[in-house]
Each structure stands twice: as structure tokens, then as C-alpha cells.
Amino acid sequence: MKKIISLLVVAVLFCTAMVGCSKSESVSTDGSTSMSKVIESLSEAFQEKTGTEVTYNATGSGAGIEAVLAGRCDIGLSSRDLKDEEKAKGLEGTILAYDGIAIIVHPGNKVSDLSLETIAKIYTGEIKNWKDVGGADGEIVLIGREANSGTRDGFESITDTEDKCKYRQECTSTGDVITAVSSNPNAIGYASLASVKDSVKAVSVDGVKPSEATVKDGSYAVQRPFVLVTKKDTKLSDSAQKFFDYITSKDAKEVSSGAGVVPAN
């Protein structure tokens, strides 16, 4: 009887160990809504390659950075560089790719090109009517992102409009900006180039059309980095480290390019 019980205990322990080994540790990411397309593409490719699940919580750049600090995720996602005060807290940023910030209008808007200076004047309220920039008579409706958005931070930094923009509507995601602009003939907004759809029109900036090629060669001025955020002195789990190594490797370059961004490596 004792021998039978011992064999049963060994069998149970063996089965438990096998179940534990069969489960891959998941990887959690949190942050920028603009990075959804590229991070979802990379996560899918990594899962097919390794069987490890990668979760993505689209909360915005600022919230993603806070999630890393609080230990709520493995890797944070930011569509802007880390600030000095964030680095001082022990955070480290690794550039994954570069993305253009498209200036978008309603498809029916006949304006197709704006200078960086004109864009700044529009968003600060100095220019208020489309007829003043070659469009139809209509009050310009300014759509932007919420405070702590990496896209907003990048846009305002490049156009030198920090704390000066006269937003009519502040959206909490890239998709919401696109929806708002597509439904209003007088609206203007900004959004990740990788996320822009046919429901809106991306205008040229100083004569340069936003594209992967013009972001890569630097001729398109309105661009920013996509950054992976980690704690400098905290070791990632084995699965998270493997995911980090994969998405920053040359092996993932084609996947990133397919998602509409310019890989940093």
C-alpha cells in the first residue's frame, strides 16, 4: 500500500511539473496608443516564433511610463523620448523605431500642403479660417491629444507650440483623433502616420509628403521616436528579455517596416 501511495505521489508531482513547464511566461506591455500597430505586429510574430503570449494595454505614453515605475508591466511604450526627470527615477529608453506624425484633415478639404509655421499659427489660433490658407470658408476646428500623450508632446515640441494650442477637442487615443477629423469637414488633427486611414487626408508639410521614405531620410520634419521603457537596475524576466531582444533585432526589421514605421536598427 505504501509503495502504491508513493508511486501516486511521484506521478502527481511529475504531471504538475510537466504542466508548469508547458506554460510560457507571458510578457506585458503598456503605453502609447500610437504604437499599437507595430507592437501588435511584433507581438504576433514573437508569439508564433516562441509560443509566448504578449499583452498590450493601450493607455498612452505617460501612463505606460508610470506603469513601468509601479511595476505593473514588463515594458513601457512611449511615443516620445524620456524626460530628464523620468531618467532620474531610474528609467531607461531604447528607441525601437521612428514614426511620422501626420497632419490630417477631412478628405473633402482641398488644402494639401501646409508649412510648419502655418501649422503652428493654426494651432495657436492666429489663423482661424481655412480660406486664409487656400481652403474653403470655414472656421478651423482644432483636434489634438490629451495631456501626457507622447504624440501631443512630439507635435507641440516640433511646432514650438507647447501650452499654446487652442484645442476644441482633446482625444485620448490616435483612433479617436482620426474619427473626429473624418467626421468634420473643418477639422484638423495630428496622428501617427502608421495609423492613418483613408477616412482622412494627410497633408504635405513644407512640400514633403509623410511616408516611410521621407521619415527615414529626414526630409519630413514632423517625426518622433517610438521608445521601449524599462527600469535600468531591474532585470527583466527571461520571456520579457527574449521579447525585448527580438523586437530590437534585425530579425524583426521587416515586421516593423510592414507596420509602417522606420526601424531604428
What residues fall within each predicted segment?
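Exported/periplasmic ABC-transporter solute-binding proteins
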Residues: 4, 22-265
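Conserved functional loop/turn residues at catalytic and ligand-binding sites
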Residues: 8, 12, 72
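Positively charged n-region of N-terminal signal peptides that target proteins for export
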Residues: 1-9
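Lipid-exposed faces of alpha-helical membrane segments in multi-pass integral membrane proteins
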Residues: 11-14, 203
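C-terminal motif of bacterial Sec signal peptides marking the signal peptidase cleavage site
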Residues: 16-20
